[in-house]
Amino acid sequence: VVATLAWTWFMLSQTPDVEARLHAELDAVLGGRLPTLADVPRLVYARAIIDEVLRLYPPVPFLSREAGKDEEFQGQPIPKGSVIVVAPWLLHRHKKLWEQPDHFIPERFLPGGAGAPSKFAYVPFSIGPRICAGMAFGQTESILCLAILAQSFRLRLKPGTNVQPICRMTLRPGDALPMTAEPRTVVAAAPGAAVAAFAPAC
């Protein structure tokens, strides 16, 4: 979650249009109050941002599995005991699988968007029986943390900072990500007013 949020703040600092759309959703859904678990299904753009960050910067960029029996893949024998490497970093950026794979486009994960071309093309938490047990918790925590902070602040990358991915157990933006928190004005709902669900235009 920590690495995912770090990448999220970095990407938001580079894409003011995405940041503005996120703030519009937070103001519409929350109206100045703190988010709760019940708000998560309505924070659809916040979820799309997290999903897109996980596509570009999967927590574990390379996965390894051991073949439990002799197999064959496209004519290539895979003996039992072979170590098979799966690279989410490459899958998530493959131009045959994704449109504009190197661009940060959260809209692809909105309802009605292109989404993942297949369940095997988007595996930030692995897939199958070895999928990360904390996937749902991690996604929910990321959305709530993003909503809490982004509602009150804009984070700006320190000028001149060169951000390079490094992998130390998880993929992170270097050893440090110096940013400045700028307070923002929250559009609060009137007392007792109902806040309409945010419906992003695709």
Task: Show which residues each predicted segment covers.
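Cytochrome P450 catalytic-core helices
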Residues: 1-25, 135-153
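Conserved cytochrome P450 K-helix/beta-meander segment immediately N-terminal to the heme-binding cysteine loop
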Residues: 20, 40, 70, 86-114, ...
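Beta-strand segments within the central parallel beta-sheet cores of soluble alpha/beta enzyme folds
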Residues: 21-27, 65, 103
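Conserved cytochrome P450 K-helix E-x-x-R motif and the immediately C-terminal K′/meander segment
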Residues: 32-74
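Cytochrome P450 heme-thiolate "Cys pocket" and heme-binding signature region
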Residues: 34-41, 62, 74-76, 93, ...
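C-terminal domain-closing interface element
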Residues: 46-62, 174-202
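Active-site proximal loops enriched in glycine and acidic residues that flank catalytic Cys/His/Asp
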Residues: 65, 87-89, 108, 126-127, ...
